Amino acid sequence: MAQTLAMTSQFNGRKRVRKFFGKIPEVAEMPNLIEVQKASYDQFLMIEEPKGGRPDEGLQAVFKSVFPISDFSGTAMLEFVGYQFDSPKFDVEECRQRDLTYAAPLKVILRLIVFDVDEDTGSKDIKDIKEQGVYMGDMPLMTTNGTFIVNGTERVIVSQMHRSPGVFFDHDKGKSHSSGKFLFAARVIPYRGSWLDIEFDAKDIIYARIDRRRKIPVTSLLMALGMDASDILSTFYNKVTYERDGDGWRIPYSVDRFKGMKLVSDLIDADSGEVVAEAGKKLTVRAAKALAEKGLKAVKVSEDDLLGSYLAEDIVNYQTGEIYLEAGDEIDEKTLRVLFDVNADQIDILDIDHMNIGAYIRNTLKVDKNESRQDALFDIYRVMRPGEPPTMDTAEAMFHSLFFDPERYDLSAVGRVKMNLRMDLDCPDTVRVLRQEDILAVVKMLVELRDGRGEIDDIDNLGNRRVRSVGELMENQYRIGLLRMERAIKERMSSVEIDTVMPQDLINAKPAAAAVREFFGSSQLSQFMDQTNPLSEITHKRRLSALGPGGLTRERAGFEVRDVHPTHYGRICPIETPEGPNIGLINSLATFARVNKYGFIESPYRKIIDGKVTTEVIYLSAMEESKHYVAQANSSLDAEGRLSEEFVVCRHAGEVLMAPRDHVDLMDVSPKQLVSVAAALIPFLENDDANRALMGSNMQRQAVPLVRAEAPFVGTGMESIVARDSGAAVAARRSGIVDQVDATRIVIRATEDLDPSKSGVDIYRLQKFQRSNQSTCINQRPLVHVGDRVEKGNIIADGPSTDLGDLALGRNVLVAFMPWNGYNYEDSILLSERIVADDVFTSIHIEEFEVAARDTKLGPEEITRDIPNVAEEALRNLDEAGIIYIGAEVQPGDILVGKITPKGESPMTPEEKLLRAIFGEKASDVRDTSMRMPPGAFGTVVEVRVFNRHGVEKDERAMAIEREEIERLAKDRDDEQSILDRNVYARLTDMLVGKVAVEGPKGFSKNKKLDTTIMGHYPRSQWWQFTVEDEKLQNEIEALRNQYDESKEALQRRFMDKVEKVQRGDEMPPGVMKMVKVFVAVKRKIQPGDKMAGRHGNKGVVSRILPIEDMPFLEDGTHADIVLNPLGVPSRMNVGQILETHLGWACAGMGKKIGDLVDLYQETGDILPLRQRIENLMPDDDHNEPVRQYDNESLYKLALQMRKGVSIATPVFDGAHEADINMMLEDAGLDSSGQVTLYDGRTGEPFDRPVTVGYIYMLKLHHLVDDKIHARSIGPYSLVTQQPLGGKAQFGGQRFGEMEVWALEAYGAAYTLQEMLTVKSDDVAGRTKVYEAIVRGDDTFEAGIPESFNVLVKEMRSLALNVELDDARELIAQRALSDTTEQ
């Protein structure tokens, strides 16, 4: 401990120091939060081949399972040797910019072996072997942050939860049959291959189903495995031998058989004939044992006792071979007579008592019509392939391929391990197919369950569900691709001259590459990354989905699957899951959880040995944990680390119980191991209702990064971990000294891990105003200064939503809980104008607009400034190439990129033809297809990118962008070169100074002692010419020179590569000649209609922004920033927000006190009061920063950080209690009630009673009114109904639904209603007329027939109901005419 104190006694101001309220020591370190993704994919790719070759897993296993491939005649074989990856063509940043996939070319080394086959003997000799590396497409690589870049966008592969392979026993809970009888079933689920179901029906007959096809009696399946009827009976039942004894029979006496039996007749000793127990008596276990001890060997039973039992063996006449009775026959009166006739003195009976042992297998045998193996195989063949005539060979081959062929059936290691565990088998996990013993064991277990022994499985237990992460999903996908390829290879091997071809000629890698592309592009589990803020990224990578291929569907998932299960504890978060149809199907991994090699989620526990809690940590899966008694992390311990309570609350086998302390053998590692990352960021989570905590977790992921990030006063200690692991904040890769810093990059001269092959310089490029997937702004800001020392892992730059390396999703604002003129009714939020003026909740959003110039049939489109019929005013912001300048302010309708498209030739009049013939060719017509700003969008152009196809001449703008990029690369190269020079020449100087030089550059007198002055006379490049006597030193100098030259060359090579990439044309989609992307940044201040939320599920919409002077204010004149409704708390039961408010108030009060002492120190130079105050605040324990070791400067830096408000950490389930909050309020000189007198800003009068005031952390969510507000006059219409489309994205209209129609009907507003249903909607002719009338300034129009009425008429006609419309006026006229003619 002393050592760490000495190291941290300097404070650099680059991290946020928090007062820690947790009491429980952190024993285990939290695993890296994106380990799930990285470890899984690394294991799949295994880029670096380990010593001794790659193990059979991941990509290696896929190739091994498909290769070797032989042709149909067996004359050639293609073997897999190994694979390797070349380096990726483009780095991550280049792929993002050019819309490419970040991937590395995969090269597979294959060996083609050609055989000479002897036609007579069939023996093979190797004729020829060829080996070759074959390109097999590109394999996407994972970025350091656990994402993939596919076509320029970041995507995440979400892990999938599915049912583990293995065997499951279950029953239908009495639902299938009217009697409510439980029908038991077993199901063997492989990783891939046919499912096998074995189930009881209502008559207790056991059936088997293969792949949910028609059922067959299970005995047919056993016969197909090669058993006959007597084998089956002897496998499942014991035999009891009955010997004839006078007029009755004698049977051996066994305690197990007779215990608990109620005797129907007297129990008679067969040897002595005496009655040892009387009829009607129940034999207890004790009595049964007593009889055995007295020497009872056999008992006598009457003939009647045989009735209803079953024969175990056939009764045969051995002379004639005639079978009198078959095994399994029931004994009745007739059977007894046959036994008497054939004089059978000894018979074997099946040990079935219908109580402990049922006759299910025997009854199934009797129902089964199949008698032999052939019948059974044919029956199974007919079920699997109906309509095909079976032969013995095809039936046998088909049955073998179902369960016993490793090509077709794979239990996987997990499935085998699960089967061994469930049925006490002992089979190595390399046996991945079913064996006869497995099927027998399943049937036996099922019968045991029906007999009331054993337990059914719980499919929602995490011991029976496993996680498929990226690597495994990818492995399955690649296998599909290779299998598609295999067919093509086989056909090609047969069709070509095999002696002359190379492996390259046999392989078409397209199917494999297509399978990978399809998986990353369109799989349900490959998702567009949620990049709103760092927390949403991290949560997305830790997500577990039960949906997706091979998983559940929303509609079919029941309540049980979605519910929280006791095994979720410490593995899956019980809080964080979406609201809505996906609830419970999409989950989040708990903070400390990890996935083991079998795909089961493990949680860490501390071992308890002899009652003492150790610091040894073990990870257990749900199956292993159920055997232990696990104490909670907050169980009270004594000074020696033993459990202090006599009885301890603990978990065991899914139950919570009080157990004696000597039973307890494990303890939780941390109280937050129960929840996910997002839930662990909510302070006072323990005081919030679960529903609101769920909303809080989900809403933190929607928080928009603000222009000025500010970490919360009241945190949980998780903030720095999330910022570090998400990759938002930049951490130093190696220790070193900061050499240069500007807004775009940090250059650090490494001082450790100086590998000659690596550069001694780390250049960190910072992302400046990049667009995220959700259009939020990614911007990194340096925290270090030139000359700063940084250690490996230190945070050197803040990213979006981070503040000094802490996650900062929102801002601390001064809140008052009180109603204010109804403006905070129904969760509305009242804000102060200060919030807007000081840009407290201002965020920057970056929109991307893309335009492509294509080659059309009528000619190429052109990007140009020369646009027909556009005023010069509209072109003022475009450069000569027709592309907007950076920095231009744009508004709706402004041109971003000018583009013209050739128009089709319109037919010419004879006059035009004549004129054209006289004056020559007129320029073909073009129309304006420029890209304009969409309605409602304002902003500033921040970046423009121009992409040209190979061979297309670049315009001026593209050249300028290219020059700029090359200059940037050159600066990087020069900086790295100068640091390299400085380092190398400093080392060379150290080597040479003080040594005698035998030789030197031109003009140097030999054998002179060198010093810096002498060396200073020569240029540095000539210093290498100095030669010293010491041979060893001279060799070192030579080595240094070689290394220096290599580094210089490598640097230049890297630079030239990058320049070449910049100058090269871009890959474009077919038909696209040129593409321009324009990025427009919008500054969004908070405004009424924006959604805000706290961390406790307390969400609301801003209702009004009030002038500062009208806001309620404190006694010292400080105005509240935000006013919330107190009625939003009690019914929602999220009291955490109130505790946070009080604690935040104390933090701010304490900050003020520290600020006063800082001012005092600046005036008087006396630091002692400040030191005492900070030391009193920060306890001296392992959790807190060792402020007592700080020197004065460090303490001053810390005080400056604290003066805005002291930051504290209150971990979930182990945080500050009420007493702690009271104490802190009193320390800060505030009222311990947390309430103060507030004054009304409008009148200056105090309010009637004290009001709760404090600091609360509020977030601005990504539901902004600017993105939602929308208006339309005319726009696109639906093709069929001719009604306007819906939604902002389609520029649609507002739906006037049936309820709105009722409202107008109720008002009797007939004309308004007619207008709504006709001209404003789908009366095509009518709406044109209205438009014309408005243009004319007229206000008369007539409504016609709505198009939707015509659709209705057409639909009725399709039902053979003809509807014709007649003109009413004509009808009336006709009627009148007919009336007059009649008269």
Curated annotation (Swiss-Prot):
EC code: 2.7.7.6
SUPFAM superfamilies in the cross-refs: beta and beta-prime subunits of DNA dependent RNA-polymerase (SSF64484)
Catalytic activity: RNA(n) + a ribonucleoside 5'-triphosphate = RNA(n+1) + diphosphate
Example GO molecular function: DNA-directed RNA polymerase activity
Gene3D superfamilies: 2.40.50.100, 2.40.50.150, 3.90.1100.10, DNA-directed RNA polymerase, beta subunit, external 1 domain (2.30.150.10), DNA-directed RNA polymerase, subunit 2, domain 6 (2.40.270.10), RNA polymerase alpha subunit dimerisation domain (3.90.1800.10), RNA polymerase Rpb2, domain 2 (3.90.1110.10)
One Pfam family from the record: RNA_pol_Rpb2_2
Keywords attached to this entry: DNA-directed RNA polymerase, Nucleotidyltransferase, Transcription, Transferase
Transferase is among the record's keywords: yes
Gene Ontology cellular-component annotations: DNA-directed RNA polymerase complex
Enzyme category, top tier: transferase
Any one GO BP annotation for this protein: DNA-templated transcription
UniProt xrefs under NCBIfam families: PRK00405.1, rpoB
Function statement: DNA-dependent RNA polymerase catalyzes the transcription of DNA into RNA using the four ribonucleoside triphosphates as substrates.
Family: Belongs to the RNA polymerase beta chain family.
Record note on quaternary structure: The RNAP catalytic core consists of 2 alpha, 1 beta, 1 beta' and 1 omega subunit. When a sigma factor is associated with the core the holoenzyme is formed, which can initiate transcription.
HAMAP family (alphabetical): RNApol_bact_RpoB (MF_01321)
PANTHER family (alphabetical): DNA-DIRECTED RNA POLYMERASE I SUBUNIT 2
Name by which UniProt lists this protein: DNA-directed RNA polymerase subunit beta
Organism: Bartonella henselae (strain ATCC 49882 / DSM 28221 / CCUG 30454 / Houston 1)
